[in-house]
C-alpha cells in the first residue's frame, strides 16, 4: 500500500462501463514513502476529500478490495488516515 495525500480530482465522461459511478482522485505519495511515483489516479469509494491523507491499494488488491474485480482499475483509495504523525 501507498500512503498519499489527495491533491485533486479527475472527471471522465467517457470510460469503461465498469467504471461508471466511480469517483477519481489524484493522489500524491508522501515524499519519503513513495516508490518513484509523482502522482497516481485512484478510484475513491470511501469519500476522501482533497487535502486528506489516504491509504492506496494497487493492482489486484485494489480491484478486490473495492469489489470491482473485472474493472480496469490499478489503484484505489481504501482508507482515510485519521492520525498521521510524521507524514510530512
Write out the residue ranges for each language-model feature.
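A structural micro-motif recognizing beta-strand termini
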Residues: 30, 43-45, 59, 81
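Short alpha-helix capping/helix-loop boundary micro-motifs
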Residues: 38-42
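C-terminal structural segments of small proteins and small subunits
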Residues: 55-88
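N-terminal first-folded block
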Residues: 1-32, 37
Amino acid at each position: 500500500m501507498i500512503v498519499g495525500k489527495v491533491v485533486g480530482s479527475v472527471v471522465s465522461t467517457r470510460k469503461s462501463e465498469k467504471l461508471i459511478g466511480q469517483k477519481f482522485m489524484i493522489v500524491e505519495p508522501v515524499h519519503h514513502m513513495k516508490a518513484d511515483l509523482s502522482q497516481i489516479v485512484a478510484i475513491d469509494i470511501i469519500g476522501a476529500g482533497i487535502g486528506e491523507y489516504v491509504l492506496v491499494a494497487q493492482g489486484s488488491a485494489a480491484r478486490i478490495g473495492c469489489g470491482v474485480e473485472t474493472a480496469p482499475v490499478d489503484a484505489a483509495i481504501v482508507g482515510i488516515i485519521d492520525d498521521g504523525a510524521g507524514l510530512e
